[in-house]
């Protein structure tokens, strides 16, 4: 019988932040420690406050950051070229001044993609509950924080009250065992999981990841997994914090200092599921024989290993899945039985809140050093933040990228989504180190294949999808 006192890591976060239970259906009034907002999902929320003449409850708990619509042109300036983007960013700036909330604007040396900037600044700490107007807020689970995305009306309520009406999720534990083989990454792990359980396999769940694979991964690798957990439907993703996390956070601008650091560490070490905690669902995945993954369709779960081939929908039983596969192949312009390594590309994109960090760029440089991208391929590398960009330049990575023929640009969400200048044309096919491959995600009629950033680099050199293990040496 379950111990009445046993709790999962998710339960501990929710219980410690619950102000009041609202009913018997699992709805609670939840306190939010940190709010991170971008220029795209916040305007209506601020307009609502202004119309009602309300102020923001806790200004110091909020960060405003420009990332979705800003240009990533190599030479940075504060001007937008798109009228809609100009309107959004100017209104963002206006609200920052009106409500006295800190803003990382386009030319701020701390600017970047919100889910990269937050951990650089030490804004995402173990035990926190963090809400943002973006679904990939799950990224912060890599630090033992609970992050989740919210809509515009919720943002307005949160700004005014520091709270949200929240419905509790079910608990899922994903245990990842084995040692990652040569050439595989955290991106391959999460892509394999999404393919295994489906795009809705974790709907209404918070996932806790554990096991040898997680223990061995770097903090930035863990962020990739938590970031893409939302692609299988999860509304939250967790990993218990450990010494790697504490070392990563230590010394960041907003992290606790001195005696407060020691007190924080003592509390953070308690952040783990109880040994006898019961999960609503358990999944085990052995990663010992994992291969690099690619998507072939228009959903993140339509993916397989690079050595595979385009599936035949007619081999599936009649039903919705067969129809989905048929629609995906028609949109992607692919034929059943085609080897993945035969698929030619026109574009290669590396960046995003999933894979735009310094460790990702180091792996890309290993593939590109001494090589050139294929004729006819346009390659773009967008660092996840201005600080990542500076670090990559200091380490000599940027020169490798430029010498290989890639465009080395400024930070922002860029081509992860068609919301700024960086947009594909109809029929363009892109090897992409991002998180979503929906129809039109990178531009109307564009075709996106998700993979690790190193795999993108290899595809850019080859001119087609290819196994990155052919380009790098093992240990």
Swiss-Prot record:
Protein EC: 4.2.1.33
Gene designation: leuC1
GO terms classed as biological process: L-leucine biosynthetic process
HAMAP family from the UniProt entry: LeuC_type1
Cofactor entry: [4Fe-4S] cluster
Protein name stated in the entry: 3-isopropylmalate dehydratase large subunit 1
Pfam families in alphabetical order: Aconitase (PF00330)
Organism per entry: Mannheimia succiniciproducens (strain KCTC 0769BP / MBEL55E)
Subunit: Heterodimer of LeuC and LeuD.
